[in-house]
């Protein structure tokens, strides 16, 4: 095959700034658990005029945290979409144990002739036919729950190699050659949360309830469930939800005896953590906490990832996170942000969420609400003064 063979993964965020074509296709991506991970392999048909038949197969091996979706396979030669089961087959059994699947085209030459030269049959000599069409193989996997214990480095790799005929004197079923394995990598992250009060020394608070959202209006919930492995709650990405309905196993997060609530399997993006119930005797946080998780990857690895580099700082170079809080307590409005402590090896951002005791005005924390409360107070004072004057009269 040729030196332009290329395995890629498609990043779901900031696509316009990633990849040679600014379309998100590159060698590195990050995803939520349960999310669809798109892959593709690009190559070109070689000059096969001298072959009677030409065998072509793509071998793929996936990390255990990736689940292959056979129905997602799409194969194109030039602008022609090939037919599964006719032009190629997806093979998942009877292959080497370290491989996940193969896509086999028994005779690439015949397939190209079928789509590009059928109407010229008998009029174009074999040695004048052009071969060199672009071949694109696309397919998806799902980041599964095996990722729960391996957030952060080293990531989850996916490898591909090609097997192809390399002896024009054979009938296409004899000697074959192989390309080196080409690898891409996916990452996922987590938030380790703890609920405390505002006293010194602080007390860990049990029983606070939370939901996670992907938008500031808190209408797009990021569903979670109790982790099947690990210590907390695992994300259920919407790609894994059937018919758009809330999953039966979806749960509300609750801080445990140590005030802990952990969220496992997050993307590099912005989330909104909303408290839905405060611990007994404490005031509810009326505004969601905005949490930004940002992973930074090495530019060279974006386009030229080398197997094993996910465990080094060549790939995942920085993990940053911040939290933005809004509060309205005892008539005072405050808004502040904190940079969170992160652990790049475990892909963890650590957040502390504080509850306070006492009464609280029923406000949302917005500046407009404060103005309205102030205006209401002024009206009440005016009414009281007027009544006192009437009594004196």
Name each region found by the language model.
Residues 1-393:
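Solvent-exposed loop/turn and edge beta-strand elements of beta-rich ligand-binding domains
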């Amino acid at each position: 095959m040729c030196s332009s063979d290329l395995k890629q993964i498609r990043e779901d965020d900031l696509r316009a700034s990633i990849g040679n074509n600014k379309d998100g296709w590159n060698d590195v991506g990050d995803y939520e658990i349960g999310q669809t991970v798109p892959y593709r392999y690009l190559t070109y048909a070689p000059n096969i005029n001298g072959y009677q038949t030409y065998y072509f197969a793509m071998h793929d091996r996936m990390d255990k945290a990736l689940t292959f979706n056979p129905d997602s396979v799409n194969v194109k030669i030039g602008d022609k979409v090939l037919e599964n089961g006719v032009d190629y087959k997806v093979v998942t059994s009877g292959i080497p144990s370290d491989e996940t699947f193969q896509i086999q085209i028994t005779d690439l030459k015949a397939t190209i002739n079928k789509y590009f030269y059928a109407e010229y049959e008998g009029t174009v000599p074999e040695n004048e036919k052009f071969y060199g069409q672009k071949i694109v193989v696309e397919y998806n996997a799902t980041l599964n729950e095996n990722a729960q214990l391996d957030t952060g480095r080293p990531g989850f790799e996916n490898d591909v190699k090609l097997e192809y005929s390399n002896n024009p004197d054979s009938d296409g079923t004899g000697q074959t050659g192989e390309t080196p394995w080409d690898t891409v990598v996916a990452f996922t992250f987590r938030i380790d949360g703890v609920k405390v009060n505002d006293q010194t020394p602080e007390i860990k608070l049990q029983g606070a309830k939370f939901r996670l959202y992907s938008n500031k209006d808190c209408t797009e919930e990021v569903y979670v469930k109790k982790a099947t492995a690990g210590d907390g709650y695992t994300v259920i990405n919407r790609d894994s939800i059937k018919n758009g309905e809330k999953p039966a196993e979806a749960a509300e997060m609750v801080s445990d005896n140590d005030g802990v609530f952990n969220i496992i399997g997050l993307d590099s993006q912005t989330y909104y953590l909303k408290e839905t119930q405060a611990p007994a005797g404490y005031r509810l946080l009326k505004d969601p906490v905005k949490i930004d998780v940002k992973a930074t990857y090495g530019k060279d690895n974006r386009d030229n990832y080398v197997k094993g580099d996910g465990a080094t700082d060549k790939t995942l170079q920085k993990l940053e996170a911040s939290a933005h809080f809004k509060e309205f307590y005892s008539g005072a409005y405050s808004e502040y942000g904190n940079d969170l402590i992160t652990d790049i090896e475990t892909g963890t951002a650590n957040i502390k969420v504080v509850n306070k005791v006492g009464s609280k005005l029923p406000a949302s924390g917005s500046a407009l609400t404060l103005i309205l409360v102030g205006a209401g107070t002024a009206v009440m004072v005016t009414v009281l003064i007027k009544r006192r004057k009437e009594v004196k009269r």
